Amino acid sequence: MRQKKVCSLCCLCSLCMNSKEDSLIRNLQYFYQSHPSYLTFVQSVASGKNHTISLRILDWLCTSYAKRHNVVIFQKDRVLHLHTMYKAFLSSHSKKLFDAFRRRQRVQVTKSGVILGDATESEDTLFISTIAQLMFFFWCYERGIIEYAEENVNAIESDLRSYVKEKQKEPSAMVVHSKVVVDFD
């Protein structure tokens, strides 16, 4: 008797995905197909070829800079606190579905959409990414974070450099070797 074939796509195929993940992928595919110029931008940032902003800058902006400097984004008639938005979206989607970096199962991004499964590059592959990274870029686009990052890239980079410098100056835990004699009378 043959065994049932087990999916090797790490919960990214329609057999394994829950309805939330499935609808998320369909929405992402629709978004990126209808915004090809933004897909080109995502490709340049994800591959490190964008000379204005990087993944590290975007991540730093959302996770640390926004918290330290109370960054607000103005959208239509609303004022949104960036760090609070980021934390709320992260808690509702988890790192599995929302992450600036490629830490999970890879997917192929082509001109025709996102291809799940084996992420080996083919002729029509634009770049390799993850669903979580594509969701992060979609979130940044929808909230105007990319524009904010491009306008304030020098301040964000400076803050990141000064933070790294501060961390390097902090003394690390020191191990002190000495003899101790304990006498019990």
Regions found by a protein language model. Name each.
Residues 121-131, 170-175:
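Intrinsically disordered, low-complexity regulatory segments in eukaryotic proteins
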Residues 2, 7, 11-103, 109-115, ...:
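Long, compositionally biased non-globular segments that serve regulatory/targeting/scaffolding roles
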Residues 89, 136-137, 175:
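Residue-level signal for the start and early helices of compact helical domains
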